[in-house]
Amino acid sequence: MQLQSYDPGNFYDELFFAPGQPRPQAAPLIDWMGQLSPEILRQHHETAQIALFNLGVTFRVYNDDQGVERIFPVDIIPRIIAEAEWRSLEKGLKQRIKALNCFLTDIYGPQNIVKDGIVPLDIVESASGFLKPCIGIKPPAGVWCHITGTDLVRDGAGKWFVLEDNLRVPSGISYVLENRRVMKSTFPDMFQTIPIQPVDSYPSQLLETLLNLAPPHLAAPVVVVLTPGINNSAYFEHSFLAQQMGVELVEGRDLVVADGYLQMRTTKGLQRVDVVYRRLDDDFIDPEVFRPDSLLGVPGLMEVYRQGRVALANAPGTGVADDKVIYAYVPEMINYYLKEEPLLANVPTYLCWREEDRNYVLDHLAELVVKSANEAGGYGMLMGPSASPQERAQFAERIRHNPRNYIAQPVLNLSRVPTLIGDQVEGRHVDLRPYILNRGDEIYVHPGGLTRVALRKGSLVVNSSQGGGSKDTWVLQGSTQ
């Protein structure tokens, strides 16, 4: 097929140095796929989409007027990462999670990082994810962020950057597992000849992480996955993970606080619950503490949690670290808490609450990406170079009105991966979301992660809600380049 003649252009390409020159880790794949005709590859691609549909791999877009569930399309040309490069990323991700966990322990405790002038108090307290009811809480094993999805990008020079931290309720791991399942059934020969690290252990790794949180001296801790319900955009994933771990999927109405413990309603009566993997935002967890109008949570849950009678993952309050203004301080957190230099760099970031930064951003909106501090999914964002003058003017007014709520970053020349578009192979921009499990005494980074791809030509927005797709991510075993 056309992979041999694929032109990576003036971008860092994950599979090719130049036309006809694959990177060492990609050479076996390119040779193998080169034997397939465009028609056969297209058939395989369509088969993969049908398989995802039959598996029910869907997501729901909140602003979709029709409320239709959509398939998250997978492109069948994978992204490949050499083992040595992956080990380097692993080290940087573990370092970052350690520092963020120290930060959460600190700001809900002595707030030394504030007292020492590293992070301003008003920045912490004005973050929508900072929850005063969590001050003084000591989560099991001192771990706040048990499950994290960290978004990484690579620039035109091949350097990795952290784009975003997702600690509150990171999603997407189900796509990683189901994409691999579909790829293995579509191309079984490739998985027999190319040494690809497996990914199917994630549910057991997650269950082990959750069981480690249970109160001590319990012979058989009960774990549940708490979902907002079937209308949530990631409901497929909630159901999938519960089924894969062999635990109950519950909604708030299935749980009740009774006799000082969290209990689950069953056909045989109430059953004590010891660990909750919660997939709803902090505000909805407990109407007695947070939003009083929440019908999704459990009244009294936070009091049971404070008493150490149930564990919650992730811990309430972790959302403060998702704030994109807080993100800008993570390199300083690494210096402050770990006495180390960051192994993974942040994207250079302008903080609009600073007058000098704000003036620069307002003068250079056409060159920058502007992001709202607490929105996700590609929403609340301005792509300056492609925005209209009217859109830039509207964003400028928003920045002036609430500068604390906005950051800006240069437009990175994101790396690309060959992607099947119609009957042609074209380069498309990608990011990478690895998944990290923090058990306190051990941090586990799942091999690969979710590669999201911007399917629209020239687009840098990879989010599923904005028309993006995904790719299987191969971390090779024994590769050094």
Curated annotation (Swiss-Prot):
Which organism is this entry from? Synechocystis sp. (strain ATCC 27184 / PCC 6803 / Kazusa)
Q: Which SUPFAM superfamilies match?
A: Glutathione synthetase ATP-binding domain-like
Which domain of life does this protein belong to? Bacteria
**Name of this chain's protein:** Uncharacterized protein sll0335
Pfam families annotated for this entry?
CP_ATPgrasp_2
Q: What's the family? A: To M.tuberculosis RV2411c.
